[in-house]
Amino acid sequence: KFGVPDSTWPVTSTNKEKEKWITLPHPGEASMSVTLPPFWSKPIHNNKLMSREQAMRVGTCIEPDENGNFQRGDKCPLHQRTIFVAIASYRDWQCKHTVTSIFHRAKYPERIRVAVVDQIVDGDDICDEPIHETCKTMPDQDICKYHSQIDVYTMDAPLAVGPVFARHIGHRQYRGEYYAMQSDAHVTFTQDWDVDIIQQQEATGDDMTVLTTYLTDIVDSIDEKTGKSLRHTRPIMVSS
């Protein structure tokens, strides 16, 4: 039987774990192979329906308990619960702006971890590079300050086989965070988005809830000075 693995914070899936990576056939070309990060754990459900008590043990905290364990589950205070953000990017110049926005507009950026699958060719913008100058010349940029909380799996764009496989690689990088979410590579976040989204999740009173949305057009949607949303309606996809 498998239990909930011990965890730490901050954590990485691409930098210090490369000796644990596994090689698998490329899903689009059997004669080729790809090397991928391993999953965080073997199936802790052991092919049985997990009890609520078991499920609520999963989830890291930015501060350990008195025994030094970061895997505190629902005993972790709301503002210390970690958030995993997976991004699949295909040659998207806006990706680094998205990553910057994630950290810059979070109320508690120290609890965010971003895992990017960056499908690029030589000369493309890189998802974890700062927007303006280098980290050496401008170390206060968000990507520089929180670089240890960003993991990037780089793939040659010609090897891409659509968004599903890229997202699979992204989610292989999950490492026990309390909340997990998926974002496009061209998203602008609103101020205190982390607190807002957790409040929405917890307000449902349902442990099985999944929040999803079709994102609103960025034009006239966010106050550039405050970072707050200027829209208070649901997105409308069709007009009649």
Predicted features along the sequence, with ranges:
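Catalytic cores of eukaryotic secretory-pathway lumenal/extracellular enzymes that build
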Residues: 2-240
